[in-house]
């Protein structure tokens, strides 16, 4: 059994000795593998080379001494532009490239023109001398700012104006501005409405026709009365307040040239509504013309900031019946009352902040009447020929306790037994002075009777 296991032990020892000798004799440098050992289908994971695996002894990653440094093939010029801001010039440019380079190197003839255009568009163009440059620069001096750009002058020419006319128009506009500033805002609209009158009405001397549309927009305004300068109206106003003369003087100062073409215009506050003070003779009348019938005047009343008080009765147009110019007091109802608001009967009487009319809105026969009656004299409005409304008459009666009561005469039955001439004879002439919206009356018989503080307080309590 032992012979079968080691038949020749000495032979094995000999083979081992021979292999060791061969290894010692082998060269130290790398030896090329045989061509049959390389397999191109194999790839090494360490060096990523084909022909051997990672466990092969031919891998340079396992034997560092045998690893070969990859050769340096040199830099490739012309592929990488290290300095893009400097174009690379070829050593031997071709004929086409040479011509192209010469064209680019040549200065362009349009460069100075382009520079000029850029300079013009980047900044303001130089100012060209214009024929009206002096006037335009003077007018735009106030627009110049130290840090802002200069104004651009257009080529549009302004119309040449006579220096005398321009100076006169400038002074006229300044005077008009001062006059309008001095007047109340309610009178400004009235002045503008008076300037819109037609030339035909001014020449014929007819009463001024104020359109209803103007009354809608204007609201509370003073009443304007147009009087022809060459003739006096038949039923004109007896007394003209000082405010009207002052306004007339201001209008003459504003428009000195227009005096020959249009008549004088006087403005006076019309009687306010039934809740405010009304002066004696404060109503102005329109004189009838020679050719045309005088239309019904439109009275725009001033609205004061006081608390409005509505009267206990309203007078429709159908209930208004006849009246004559000789009546104690004639009032023409405005035809545009339906547009301005509810129709209220205009009341007349003297009422200042310290005195109040006791029964100015009471119906007739409210208190016993005395045989003596006094009525304030007012200017008479002529009845309109085309309008069915007729003048109203208000009668003031003196009561036993010293108070006054007013009654509206709308029917012939309410006429007093005395004649209208008696009222006119008894009524004193009162000169009034209007200062702004408040109307003050100098002492008179009617003024003394109404100036009772107790009666004013009682009248306020009765009205409330």
From Swiss-Prot:
UniProt superkingdom: Eukaryota
Compositional bias per record (Polar residues), positions renumbered to this chain: 344-355
Composition bias type Low complexity, residue spans: 180-197
Biased composition (Basic and acidic residues): 74-83, 97-114
Pfam family, one: zf-CCHC_6
InterPro entries: FAM90 (IPR039213), Znf-CCHC_6 (IPR041670)
Region annotated Disordered, chain positions: 1-43, 71-294, 312-386, 412-437, 445-464
Family per record: Belongs to the FAM90 family.
Name of this protein: Protein FAM90A1
Organism, as annotated: Homo sapiens (Human)
Lineage: Eukaryota, Metazoa, Chordata, Craniata, Vertebrata
């Amino acid at each position: 059994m032992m012979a079968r296991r080691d038949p020749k032990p000495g032979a094995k020892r000999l083979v081992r000795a021979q292999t060791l000798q061969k290894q010692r004799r082998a060269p130290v440098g790398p030896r090329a593998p045989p061509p049959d050992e390389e397999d191109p289908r194999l790839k090494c994971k360490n060096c990523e080379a084909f022909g051997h695996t990672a466990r092969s002894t031919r891998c340079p990653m396992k034997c560092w001494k045998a690893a070969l440094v990859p050769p340096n093939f040199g830099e490739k010029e012309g592929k990488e532009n290290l300095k893009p801001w400097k174009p690379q010039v070829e050593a031997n440019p071709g004929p086409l490239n040479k011509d192209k380079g010469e064209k680019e190197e040549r200065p362009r003839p349009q460069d100075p023109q382009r520079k000029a255009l850029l300079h013009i568009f980047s900044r303001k163009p130089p100012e060209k001398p214009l024929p009206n440059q002096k006037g335009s620069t003077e007018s735009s001096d106030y627009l110049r700012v130290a840090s802002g750009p200069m104004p651009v002058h257009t080529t549009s020419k302004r119309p040449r104006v006579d220096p005398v006319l321009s100076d006169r128009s400038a002074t006229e506009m300044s005077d008009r501005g001062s006059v309008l500033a001095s007047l109340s805002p309610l009178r400004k609209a009235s002045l503008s409405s008076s300037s819109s009158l037609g030339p035909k009405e001014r020449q014929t001397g007819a009463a001024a026709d104020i359109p209803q549309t103007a009354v809608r927009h204007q609201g509370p305004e003073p009443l304007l009365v147009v009087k022809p300068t060459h003739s006096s109206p038949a039923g004109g106003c007896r007394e003209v307040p000082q405010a009207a003369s002052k306004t007339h003087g201001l209008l003459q100062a504003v428009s000195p040239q227009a005096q020959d073409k249009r008549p004088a215009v006087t403005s006076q506050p019309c009687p306010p509504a039934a809740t405010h003070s009304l002066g004696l003779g404060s109503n102005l009348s329109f004189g009838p013309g020679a050719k045309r019938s005088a239309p019904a005047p439109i009275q725009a009343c001033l609205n004061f900031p006081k608390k409005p008080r509505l009267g206990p009765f309203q007078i429709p147009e159908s209930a208004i019946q006849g009246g004559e110019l000789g009546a104690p007091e004639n009032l023409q109802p405005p035809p545009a009352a339906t547009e301005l608001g509810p129709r209220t009967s205009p009341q007349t009487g003297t009422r200042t902040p310290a005195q109040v009319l006791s029964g100015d809105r009471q119906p007739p026969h409210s208190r016993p009447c005395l045989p003596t009656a006094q009525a304030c004299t007012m200017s008479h409005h002529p009845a309109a020929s085309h309008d069915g409304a007729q003048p109203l008459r208000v009668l003031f009666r003196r009561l036993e306790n010293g108070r006054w009561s007013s009654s509206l005469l709308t029917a012939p039955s309410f006429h007093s037994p005395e004649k209208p001439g008696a009222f006119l004879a008894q009524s004193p002439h009162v000169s009034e002075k209007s200062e702004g919206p408040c109307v003050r009356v100098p002492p008179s018989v009617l003024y003394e009777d109404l100036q009772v503080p107790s009666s004013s307080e009682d009248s306020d309590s009765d009205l409330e």
